[in-house]
């Protein structure tokens, strides 16, 4: 089974550039006329991808239901790293690529963690978690 996480976006080019630069994700598919794959997808892992759909078409995908307002979410998107330095590197790249810092990386009881929002307001958590 293929799992696809789908998020609404405001601008394809901006979202494409952010996920390339901030998280170093690998695009899926052949580039279209604008140089960006259509649909805009990134490989997250074996059998898992991230699809980014313009907000104007997102409601259609939902069966003509309105998409939540930007910045409202009941979902955390999380990256798990092997070292604290890797967390810091992702935060540096994300900030340069246009992320808004929510919580800069710091040591918590469960590990080294921080969070940011992408340019469309989706919340990402990056963690080097303590072993369970």
Model-derived features: where do they sit?
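Vicinal oxygen chelate
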Residues: 2-10, 40-44, 63-132
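Short, basic, helix/turn surface patches
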Residues: 55-60, 128-132
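Short catalytic micro-motifs in class I SAM-dependent methyltransferases
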Residues: 4, 23, 125
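Core segments of cupin and vicinal oxygen chelate
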Residues: 7-58
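A residue-level signal for beta-strand positions that form part of recognition/binding surfaces
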Residues: 49, 74, 123
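Hydrophobic pocket/interface hotspot
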Residues: 15, 19, 87, 94
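A short, polar/proline- and glycine-enriched secondary-structure boundary/capping micro-motif
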Residues: 61-64, 99
